[in-house]
Amino acid sequence: MRICIKRVYEAASPDDGERILVDRLWPRGLSKEKAAIDIWEKDVAPSAALRKWFGHDPDKFDDFRNKYRKELEDNPAIKRLEDMIHHLGKDKKVTLLFGAKDETHNQAAVLKEYLDSNDN
């Protein structure tokens, strides 16, 4: 299974495979048609409190990563996502979509690390 991340505002591509939005909130100004999302897994997104605390501040990213990973460990929605990805098959590509402008310091990057570390 190949897992990638991509800004939801970038154009959809057949190379994206299964497109999964991992934001709790729908991306501003983006129609459902243009987003071309297969699945919206908002329950695996960081809690509202953690998202607000982080505020996409790169200086807080290491702490954010640790706190978000802890949330994921305690979140039953992550198991559903892992199972879904597993059932897609090893040859399928999955693209985790996020709305943040920072392509490095965001929840999708942490979620990808988490899923990769669990061999999904």
What is each stretch, according to the model?
Residues 1-120:
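Residues lining hydrophobic/aromatic ligand-binding pockets adjacent to catalytic sites
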